Regions:
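Active-site metal-binding motif and surrounding structural segment of the metallo-beta-lactamase
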Residues: 9-55, 176-183
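Metallo-beta-lactamase
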Residues: 61-125
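Short, solvent-exposed loop/turn segments at secondary-structure boundaries
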Residues: 6, 158-163, 194-198
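Active-site-proximal loop/helix segments of hydrolase catalytic cores
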Residues: 121-175
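Active-site metal-binding loops of divalent metal-dependent hydrolases
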Residues: 3-6, 33-34, 55-56, 127-129, ...
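Divalent metal-coordination and catalytic microenvironments
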Residues: 3, 18, 33, 45, ...
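Divalent-metal (often Zn2+) His-rich catalytic cores of metallo-beta-lactamase-fold enzymes
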Residues: 51, 139, 166-206
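Conserved beta-strand hairpin/beta-sheet module of binuclear metal-dependent hydrolase folds
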Residues: 1-19, 137-150
Length: 206
C-alpha cells in the first residue's frame, strides 16, 4: 500500500475496493511524506508494517501532540507549520476533529531503503524537492514504475506556493537516476516518464 489516505473513511473505501476485486488486504504500507492526506489513515490500518523516512516519522510524532481548535489551527498556519491550502480540505474530511488519529510508521529509514517482496523489490529514496523536505519516492525496478507521492509539486506552506529553482533541479536530477516508464502520484492519473518530465519542465521557479 502506497500512502495510507487521509482518514478511516479512506482506508475503509480502499479495503472495500480490494475485496470487491478479489485482492488481499495489504500487510505493508509505505508513506511518501508527512502531509495529512497521505498519512492520517495509518492509525486505522490493522496488522500492517509501515515505512517512512526518519524526518516523516519525526513530523508525525510532533503532530500527535497538536490540538485541533480553530485557534490552534490558525496559529499553525501563521507560524508556517501548516498550509492554509490544506486546512479547508481537512475540515471537510474531519468535521469532528476528535476523529483525527495520527500514528508514526513502524519502520523508519534515512536516505534509502530496499524492501524485498519476493521476486519484486521496492526501492525507497529521499530526493530533495520543493514540496516537503521529508519526501521520498518508491521505485519498482521490475515494473519500471515509480510512485512519487507529491514530490513533484510545489511548496504549499507560503502564501504564494512556490517551486524553488535549486531544489527543483535536484529533484529532476534525482529522478533521472531511475529507469522508469510508468509514473504514479498522489493526485494524478497514471502517466509516462515523458509526461512527467514535460510537467516538471513547465513550471516557474523562484
Amino acid at each position: 500500500m502506497l500512502d495510507s489516505g487521509a482518514s478511516k473513511r479512506h482506508v475503509d473505501m480502499f479495503m472495500q475496493q480490494l475485496e470487491e476485486n478479489g485482492l488481499p488486504k495489504p500487510d505493508l504500507c509505505i508513506l511518501t511524506h508527512n502531509h495529512w492526506d497521505h498519512t492520517y489513515g495509518l492509525a486505522h490500518l490493522e496488522n500492517v508494517t509501515s515505512f517512512a523516512t526518519k524526518s516523516t516519522n519525526e513530523l508525525l510524532k510532533k503532530m500527535q501532540a497538536w490540538g485541533w481548535s480553530d485557534e490552534e489551527m490558525k496559529n499553525r498556519i501563521e507560524t508556517g507549520e501548516a498550509s492554509a491550502f490544506s486546512y479547508p480540505h481537512l475540515n471537510l474530511e474531519y468535521p469532528d476533529k476528535s476523529m483525527i488519529k495520527i500514528a508514526p510508521a513502524t519502520v523508519e529509514y534515512t536516505d534509502k531503503l530496499t524492501i524485498d517482496l519476493g521476486g519484486v523489490t521496492v526501492k525507497l529514496k529521499e530526493i530533495e524537492n520543493s514540496h516537503s523536505y521529508d519526501c521520498a519516492v518508491a521505485y519498482i525496478p521490475e515494473e519500471k514504475c515509480i510512485f512519487l507521492g507529491d514530490i513533484h509539486y510545489e511548496d504549499l506552506l507560503p502564501v504564494q506556493p512556490a517551486y524553488y529553482a535549486d531544489s527543483h533541479a535536484k529533484l529532476i536530477s534525482g529522478l533521472r537516476k531511475f529507469d522508469f516508464d510508468k509514473v504514479l502520484s498522489g493526485h494524478q492519473m497514471l502517466m509516462s516518464n515523458v509526461d512527467l518530465y514535460a510537467q516538471l519542465a513547465n513550471v516557474e521557479t523562484v
